[in-house]
Amino acid sequence: MTRKRHRSLLSLAVLLACVDGAPAQQPPQTFSEQLDIREREIVVALPDNLAGKALRPRDFQVLVDGRPREVTRAEPVSREGPAPWTILVYVDRVLASPGTVFYSNLALAEHARDLTGLGSVEVVLADADPGTVLPPSREPRQVEQTLAGLAGKARIERDRARTEVPAPPSDLQVGRQLDKLLAFLAARHPAGPHALFLVADGSAPAPARSTAAPETAFRDASRLLAASGWVGVALAVRRDAPGTPVAPKSELDLFEEGTATPGATNGPPPPIRGRAPGKSTLAFPRVIDLFIDARLAPLHALATATAGTLIGYDVQLPALFAELPRRWAIWISEPEAPADGRLHTLTVRLPRRKAEARAPQWLR
């Protein structure tokens, strides 16, 4: 009886010891997980009829190599704050003749306030190697003086070139200069929308040369610029006037022309309609010629691939400076797998609006 009680007391003591030695009961833990969503920003230009419309992410359809990507956000670039653009004016004196450098810089100098109205402006001169002549600035006066100074120096060379025609750059020089441009931009990763104003000439059509190397070099550079998000504005401003603007024909005009009977003289004379020229710069005959000039084909390809434009006359600049602030920024989800470094085709549509946005054609 005593042994049994002793064992009972011993068992109770062990149990109490275990209870006293056990850690106090902790409150249930709560876990928080941070979800890392990878996004890529793409700047697009919308059709004029969608300007000012309220759009949502579901209005956009983004295809990468033909496969849809989720659009997570969409908003006008103006919501990123006043003057959100990063502007880089890149004057290549090897790719551009003195005349092109003179007229292009002079035209930009006259729009210095429009440039700085977009955002910060940096001016780079590539004599052979690129170098910054004006660090990023938002002061219109500084930008104007810098560009006017470059135009003044180019004018002296242009006047000298009237008696000594400079030889165009060789295929090797074209490729080398574009490589230097890409290397210069590779060190820059601006946040938000960014545009490259490239002062350069085109090249002679391929049949006039032994190879198509310049076209290939421009094509490859254009794809890399597009994949980096640069909006390419190619400037090859000319001396001559763009011509007298022509009013576009209305549907009624086209119908009357198509149904008119040749040689008919009966009845009253047709009414004479006075119509104002269209607001589009394509109303200027020589502006249209820019896009069919074989020598400018490399620059046109650059502008197309990057959702930019080709400027050959200063009358085109006001429309450009009015259009850039109206662009939209959309963000698409990125795959979890690491980027493979290859270039992928990019298309941005608005199916509900039956429209397609102008977007960079390539993504990396």
Language-model-derived ranges and their functions:
Residues 11-20:
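Bacterial N-terminal signal peptides
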Residues 2-10:
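Bacterial N-terminal signal peptides that target proteins for export
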Residues 3, 22-23:
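Intrinsic low-complexity/disordered segments
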Residues 24-364:
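Scaffold/interface architecture of coatomer-like assemblies
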